[in-house]
Amino acid sequence: MFLISILKKAFGFGVMPKLASLVNLLLLPLITPFLTPFDYGIWGVITSYSGLFITIAPLGLNLFLTNSYYEYSNHWRVLWGRVICYFYLSGILLSIVYICVIMGMLSEVCIQKRFLIAMISCVPLLLFGNTVIAQHLYPLKGTPKPLVYRTLLGSICGMTVSFVSIYFFKAGYWGFLFGVAVTAIVSFTLFCPLLFKKEGIKPIIDRKWKKLVDMLKLSWPLIPHALGFVLLSSSSRIIMNLYQVSLEDIGLFSNGYMMGDYITIITTSLVVALVPQLQKTYRDKRFSDYRSLYYFCQFTTLTAVFTVAIWMPDIYRVVIRNESFQSCSAIASIICFANVLLPFYNFTSNVAFIKKDSKQLLWLIFMPGAVNIFLSIILIPILGYVSVVYSTLVSYWTIAIIPFFVPYFHKNTKVWMGKLNRIIVILLLSLIHISEPTRPRLIS
């Protein structure tokens, strides 16, 4: 019954909100004939910069959402109201900065188009607040429907706009831009009455800036922590853009990364569904149960990754109806394996969140992000965009070695993992599995 409950919640919180993405995957055979590596290059650069700003925008204040829900059962809505107001203010200020950054990039695009690209693509940054609040609230309440239905409707609206723009109007990358803007507007609008009226989370303007300063003192380490995750996923394309790698090459990498990253739906759905269990088992010091949940997530992810990686060339032949992108299947397979250790990150970081040791989170993700940047800077001028695939894999997997040399994680990981050599076993299993489906294509 417990396993069935987990699977139901995993489907509700993880798969259902991503259903539009899965439908979009099915639409790729229809739209890829009308897309080029240049279109994916533009889209890859835009998503890298926008992802960077959207990650910074919460200012780490989401740290207080989960903890306050458990610790202040009668007053958590007041704190959440302040946080959502800070989110709105942050979105406005960072949108202005983002527009200026985009105007300085994309030198291959004329300045008039750059301005339109910047204005349209900043909409998700401007309106991120409601969605972030909902993504924290409903997993904690264990009620997926309010989150799922609204997220799904917003995603379907955006996906429909993208499809119509690309398939019927041959709009190329503009179709992606229109789609994400519509998704953000619809989602923001749908969550307003739900959060403000039904849940009683109303924006509270707090003129006592000292409270915000005090909160930021605790939350600021989460900014580089969250930023580190973006450095892992987006820094490569930003560095390629700064090195003036052609948008066509960036587009090939972006296409492979997009396809490989679909595997995170499984990891995300499992972990989000398990959030209440993770909190309860660790807080109750039931560490063997915590470890069992980790094994369940880790081996489910490994099995899914291996299966998808084996079939990736065939998936490309069916889904990507464009010869220009067929070589990207090798990139997609490796990106799948880059994500295989994400359950370890989620379970390890959860401990630091519970203990409110936010500064320690910097090790978990900022260091791998720094490794990715370092390798990209060194290798891109020598090997081109292909080197980015290898640097992404190496940097993602460095998460697994952190408990061996960082005292904080060495101590706390041993509490729930037991012997740390179990991490080595999992790492070796991943290495063995990656060799089979990808070795011939890695050599080529």
Regions found by a protein language model. Give the residues of each.
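Alpha-helical transmembrane segments of multi-pass membrane transport and lipid-handling proteins
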Residues: 25, 84-110, 267, 291-342, ...
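Hydrophobic alpha-helical transmembrane segments
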Residues: 148-197, 366-374, 385-406
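Single conserved hydrophobic/aromatic residue that forms the stacking wall/gate
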Residues: 432-444
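Helix-loop junctions and terminal segments of transmembrane helices
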Residues: 28, 57-74, 256, 260-284, ...
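Interhelical loop/hinge segments that connect adjacent transmembrane helices in multipass membrane
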Residues: 1-6, 145, 169, 173-179, ...
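Interfacial/gating helices of multi-pass transporter permease domains
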Residues: 28-52, 173, 211-218, 240-261, ...
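Transmembrane helical elements of multi-pass membrane transporters/channels
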Residues: 9-24, 154, 179-195, 209-279, ...
